[in-house]
């Protein structure tokens, strides 16, 4: 293992210490698009985690054989192949979720987090470290998606995973659903509050 970085650090640091969305401000588009429901956010989190981990692994395995002039093309080809596999599995076994996620599974190919880890880490590190780093960054991305989706679905519709938590007034209950949280701008507010919370907890993340 290079330097003093442990597998534990590679796996856990992206969740709070160096979160791809909260600190690096990457992957924001999908964080807005797929977080209206916890179910879609959870599936997207798993998909990105698998693609990031496996793409890092494969890029690292062949890194010494990739000509520098075409390294980005090779990385994209590996990532695209993995995304196609994930997309086909979703269509085969979870067609409803695949329809809800729509084009956003395919857009994992252009996700800055996936490309960034392949270029910045996997091209310079051994396979096992690269795989763990990819899984860690996928978990960091996924954890933010799940946090955002939790609040958006709960406040926006009174549900979690499609199950009623707060009975809405329309259905004879007491809760007035806030439709604003089902719109994309609400995700910005939630992400902002999470960033504020993280930087209050970890002052070293605050920009000078």
UniProtKB/Swiss-Prot annotation:
Catalytic activity: a ubiquinone + n Na(+)(in) + NADH + H(+) = a ubiquinol + n Na(+)(out) + NAD(+)
GO molecular function, one term: oxidoreductase activity, acting on NAD(P)H, quinone or similar compound as acceptor
Signal peptide: none
BP-aspect Gene Ontology terms: sodium ion transport
Annotated keywords: Cell inner membrane, Cell membrane, Ion transport, Membrane, NAD, Sodium, Sodium transport, Translocase, Transmembrane, Transmembrane helix, Transport, Ubiquinone
TM helices/strands, residue ranges: 42-62, 72-92, 103-123, 131-151, 178-198
UniProt EC number: 7.2.1.1
A Pfam family recorded for this sequence: Rnf-Nqr
Enzyme type, top EC level: translocase
Subcellular localization(s) per the UniProt record: Cell inner membrane
Membrane topology listed for this record: Multi-pass membrane protein
A GO CC term attached to the entry: plasma membrane
Record's subunit section: Composed of six subunits; NqrA, NqrB, NqrC, NqrD, NqrE and NqrF.
Record family assignment: Belongs to the NqrDE/RnfAE family.
HAMAP family the UniProt entry points to: NqrD
PANTHER family named among the record's database cross-references: ELECTRON TRANSPORT COMPLEX PROTEIN RNFE, NA(+)-TRANSLOCATING NADH-QUINONE REDUCTASE SUBUNIT D
Function: NQR complex catalyzes the reduction of ubiquinone-1 to ubiquinol by two successive reactions, coupled with the transport of Na(+) ions from the cytoplasm to the periplasm. NqrA to NqrE are probably involved in the second step, the conversion of ubisemiquinone to ubiquinol.
The protein's name: Na(+)-translocating NADH-quinone reductase subunit D
Provenance organism: Haemophilus influenzae (strain ATCC 51907 / DSM 11121 / KW20 / Rd)
Gene that encodes it: nqrD
